[in-house]
Amino acid sequence: MLDYIATGALAPAHVEAIVSGVCDGCRQAGAALLGGETAELPGMYADGHYDLAATAVGVVERAKILGPDRVQVGDVVLGLASDGLHSNGYSLARKALLDPAYAGLQLDATLPGSDMSVAAALLRPTRIYVKSM
């Protein structure tokens, strides 16, 4: 795994907390955080704003690559139910939940259909499914 953190002004305690969370996720997935980049970009980000990205790369032996030639009638496909928004759903969720043109909720409001606040729902970590398989 490689990570990337960008911000307008580095706050070492915040960066340490972010990297610690990434390391926790790596441990859950049985992956290693091999490196990454931390960028201070005052012209791009306001103080206190962060951009976080990560890339995971795996290796598989050529003989074990799953392709159309290895799929047969009777094979089973497993599906796991999602338990939240996950990494790619937050931009749309923020817009739908917080924008007055849509739901217009406040961060401290209870998320409809749940017992948690909108803020708590938006801050839930993405589930790592590796061990579920």
PLM-predicted stretches and their roles:
Residues 1-133:
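Helix-biased detector of long, well-ordered alpha-helical tracts
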